């Protein structure tokens, strides 16, 4: 029971991922959230943090273009909504993980 409690508490913690100044508008950085490779993206003052793996074929999304509120997998063109992780263009049919993001005092934090 103690192990389960500690695991649940850890999962709810905010993790520091980047300084706001390290991610220019339109930029992105690779980060780790909850031991998962993730991508932190910035659009104006908004930050998004998504799992950095295409659910279709496991390709990293790191170099994919951002368009129409989503990120495009550079391999087969699947697009995922940055807010929800939902696939919005084939061939992907499964969502990717999206992490909650919070900005405090010039620092960006994320959590599952």
Where are these regions (language model features)?
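A conserved active-site-flanking secondary-structure segment within enzyme catalytic domains
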Residues: 90-91
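N-terminal pre-ligand scaffold of iron-sulfur
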Residues: 5-68, 81-82, 86, 95-112
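Short cysteine clusters
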Residues: 54, 73-76
